[in-house]
Amino acid sequence: LLSTENIGLNGPFQTVIMQGASFEPLTSQDRATFQATVVHYADKVRAHGAEPMLYMTHAYVPPHPRTDANMIDTIAQTYQAAAKAAQAAVAPVGLAFARSYQQRPDYSLHMTFDGTHPNLQGTYLGACVVYLSLYGGNLDGLNYDYFGRLPKGEARYLQKIAEETIADFQAATQ
């Protein structure tokens, strides 16, 4: 799993990004298992010379049957506790989704058929958050629009959400 030659790389990984299943924060037993698993794999990542990072998942939205307005709070607490126990960084993707839905409730980031998987906009937002979590800075000059499928105004909105989320998350966790 952590052998770079398996994917054609000649050097070690610098960062390994890990994500749990979306249901793991939903019960205390699953949260405990998640945290123990994160600690275990973070140790393996470090043993291979890399740093661990967690990709914080986003909350379910309708039509998912387990939609809960407070789900993102549970997710954030779960990921932050696991990151602290594992001494890992967090890419707060779930918080970026929540911020976007607060600012523009009708702007969808999820596939409409299940309310759990991200659509193009959600995937773009997640990528922006991960980029900023890894490299810092800002997204000025990022012109990628998925071959014209993401209008420039939408791309800039999602970049702004990512930048604001990272700034607030870093201020709250440092």
Q: How would you label these PLM feature ranges?
A:
Residues E5-L120, L132:
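Alpha-helical cap/lid subdomain in secreted, periplasmic
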Residues H110, H117, A127-Q174:
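Conserved catalytic region of serine esterases and O-acyltransferases that act on ester linkages
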Residues G122-L125:
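Mature-region segments of soluble proteins
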